[in-house]
Amino acid sequence: MGMLAVKYQIGLHVDCCLGGFVLPFAKKLNYKIPDFDFSVPGVSSMSLDTHKYGYALKGTSVVLYAFKELRQSQYFCYADWTGGECA
């Protein structure tokens, strides 16, 4: 898929929400895990749920971007959220 993303100059998002925090350690233990991260040409973003195996609070997640230009489009402010301001 990474080769297609490069060929057609489109973004490739990798959903690592389940296992994203475990897979790098499994690779270090010599499990045969295919490359899935920014080492794959064409991968432009990844998501990880920190509340699953990252031991963070329920509902927290992380989005990682390969390029700053992609990240700049992500920011928003929503003041009517019941938990307060979210930015």
Name every feature range the model reports, one short phrase each.
Residues M1-A26, P41:
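Catalytic PLP-binding core of fold-type I/II PLP enzymes
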